[in-house]
Amino acid sequence: MTRKIAIYGKGGIGKSTTTQNTAAALAFFHEKNVFIHGCDPKADSTRLILGGLPQQTVMDTLRIEGAERVTVDKVVKTGFKDIRCVESGGPEPGVGCAGRGVITAIDLMEENEAYSEDLDFLFFDVLGDVVCGGFAMPIRDGKAEEVYIVASGEMMAIYAANNICKGLAKYARQSGVRLGGIICNSRNVDGEKEFLEEFTKAIGTKMIHFVPRDNIVQKAEFNKQTVTEFQPEANQAQEYRELGRKIIENEDFVIPKPLAMDELEAMVVKYGLMD
């Protein structure tokens, strides 16, 4: 049975990097069949898996050829360890709604049976901290069953995580989606781990893994690879291996209890993140 997971988090927090490195570790170390569906108009959710190759998006194919000619072969590409990849794409800049593109792309993938039954994991890598409209579709309509939020010990990352939890709590009862935990993509700020542990406990979940900051991630990206492909014996590859293991074994799924703004600000002040 395929586990369907949406990855959310503040813009620039490293969602796509975390998603791709986790997917690579699941495929390489744990021998899982993985599919990544990029839900960002930038269409950069799968480039490390595909060795930096540009991918024609679902929306581009729709514009060029029409819905009736969109096929799995045209828009789904296979990369490292047979990880399958598709990018929703979006409208031309300044025209239309990118969220609508996410809805259209997911619907088309389902109609074309792209999410095959042999998959162990299907990841939706979702734009920024937007939890309304089309970008909420994976959690609103039950396309994803689990959510992991990528955060750090920085103030705005925590604010974004709390806002995502508000959206998740709103849709959870109607769609059945649940929060599986917070992934800390470390920025090496003071008290980061302690802050994340207190925040996750307060909202009723856990920090599923603390991913330390390591320059090998950037080195691998320069080589258009995930860390696991670039240097599988590296410490950072083992961190993603461990994150993958924790996701595989995770059975702790909750409806989060987001903090009120005064509670959140008090926590931020406690850890010295606000002047």
Swiss-Prot record:
Is RNA-binding set as a keyword in this record?
Answer: no
Listed Pfam families:
Fer4_NifH
Which PROSITE patterns does this one have? Answer: NIFH_FRXC_1, NIFH_FRXC_2, NIFH_FRXC_3
NADP found in the keyword field: no
Q: Where are the transmembrane segments?
A: none
Misc: This subunit is associated with the iron-iron nitrogenase component 2 (the third type of nitrogenase).
Protein name per UniProt: Nitrogenase iron protein 2
Q: Which organism is it from?
A: Rhodobacter capsulatus (Rhodopseudomonas capsulata)
